[in-house]
């Protein structure tokens, strides 16, 4: 009985110790938006990453679908009846992908812009900071231009977001 009591007490002690907060560890190697754009290398990689988002717009043929989708170039393709018949709506996968890709890239631009405007990044001189800010603003404007061309009045978030925004003022 004494052995059973010792085992029971030991098990309960271990169970109670597992809920202590001193066992929680901070992941120092995890990259987040909060710590990614705090160094010169991080902000440089962030700006370079903005250019890789343009690949989706041009290589994945979003602009071809948006500009030439209803023309006779796409007649032979199956699954493009909405384009051919001019009955494209928000349920179209190409339209949704274009919208999502553009706003995902706008959010990345906003994160870089906010970091450049609000953080004093060690090792980043004023000329490089100005260049990175100009590149980020231009790429964001590029996406807004294509969104406005395709959809008209659109929401234009100018701050990075982590969740769905249901109410954004139009500019």
Predicted regions and their residues:
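Hydrophobic, small-residue-rich alpha-helical packing segments that form membrane-like cores
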Residues: 160-161, 171
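Conserved, well-structured interaction surfaces
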Residues: 44-48, 52-53, 79-151, 165-170
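Proline-centered turn/helix-capping motifs that create local helix->coil transitions or kinks
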Residues: 21, 58-59, 73-76, 147-156
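Short clusters of hydrophobic/aromatic residues that line enzyme substrate/ligand-binding pockets
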Residues: 23, 31, 36-37, 69, ...
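Membrane-proximal, proline-rich intrinsically disordered regions
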Residues: 20-64
């Amino acid at each position: 009985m004494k052995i059973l009591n010792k085992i029971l007490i030991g098990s309960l002690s271990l169970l109670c110790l597992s809920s202590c907060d001193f066992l929680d560890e901070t992941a120092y190697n995890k990259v987040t938006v909060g710590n990614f754009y705090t160094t010169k290398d991080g902000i440089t990689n962030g700006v370079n990453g903005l250019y890789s988002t343009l690949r989706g717009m041009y290589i994945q043929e979003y602009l071809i679908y948006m500009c030439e989708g209803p023309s006779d170039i796409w007649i032979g393709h199956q699954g493009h009846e909405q384009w051919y018949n001019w009955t494209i709506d928000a349920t179209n996968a190409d339209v949704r992908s274009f919208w999502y890709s553009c706003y995902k890239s706008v959010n990345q631009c906003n994160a870089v812009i906010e970091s450049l405007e609000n953080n004093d990044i060690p090792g980043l001189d004023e000329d490089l900071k100005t260049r990175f800010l100009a590149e980020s603003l231009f790429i964001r404007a590029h996406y807004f231009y294509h969104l406005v061309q395709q959809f008209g009045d659109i929401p234009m978030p100018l701050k990075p977001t982590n969740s769905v925004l249901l109410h954004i003022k139009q500019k």
